[in-house]
Amino acid sequence: MNSKIYIVGMGPGTGEMMTPQADQALCGSDVIVGYPVYLKLLGGKYREKEFLSTPMKQEVRRCEMCFEEAEKGKTVAMVCSGDAGVYGMASLLYEMSEAHPGCELEVIPGITAANSGAAALGAPLNHDYCVISLSDLMTPWELIEKRLAAAAMGDFCMAIYNPSSHHRADYLKKTCDILQKNGVEPERACGYVENIGRENTACEVCTLAELRERQVNMFTTVFIGNSRTKIIGGKLVTPRGYVLPDPAV
């Protein structure tokens, strides 16, 4: 029988936004592996489980721990914030699994920040959209610039992950400049959400020009509307294109 590793997307971090399938996988695991912040967010519900963690930038070691525990006959869960297949650990575990043919992997989907953040703001992704991370840790900034420019020229709505950090404090400002250079007007409707799904969640709707001057952190997801996105009752809304009835009729 194959050893089992669940790759679990835990959503924003609160139990209410974790799927029943994710909860079932965690309850059925002997060992839960993850970044310390994510393990802390799980709270006390799984305290009878064995928790293993590594700090940031030790993701490969974290995956090795999963295989080591699974090969001892334990059922293992690797937890990721949001969805494990969206800037998560799913692809790395699959790449490493070639050296561990006796381990069976199963991805458990979670609610990613693009979806949970969009819900908090209204309906900003109701048409074609793309997700772009501003982290240049593993992607050259020059390539990120090309993707931002292409999204702007294609009039996509955008969900921007990892908009800032201590070492990338000006990246959101640079992003807004790139978008304006490629046809996005300063008045474009935008928004952002900090600490999605947690007690101190904060949302703001603004223009691109206003967004350029905002200070955000690594727990923020930024939303850029397309040319038809508008603000309705304080919410960010991208029309799907339906023909509305004439209110005068």
What is each model feature region?
Residues L39-L41, E59-V60, I111-N115, L137-P140, ...:
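Short gly/pro/ser/thr-enriched loop/turn and capping motifs at secondary-structure boundaries
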Residues V86-G154:
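Class I SAM-dependent methyltransferase SAM-binding "motif I" and its flanking Rossmann-like core
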Residues G11-M17, T139-W141, E204-C206:
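Short gly/ser/thr-rich secondary-structure transition/capping motifs
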Residues M1-L105, S116, R212, A248:
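Class I S-adenosyl-L-methionine
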Residues M1-N2, Q24-A25, E69-A70, M78, ...:
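Solvent-exposed alpha-helices and their adjacent loops that cap or buttress functional pockets
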Residues M10-T14, G34-V37, T54-M56, S81-D83, ...:
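Fold-independent oxyanion-binding glycine-rich loops
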Residues I5-I7, V76, M153-V249:
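A contiguous loop/helix-start segment that scaffolds small-molecule binding in enzyme catalytic cores
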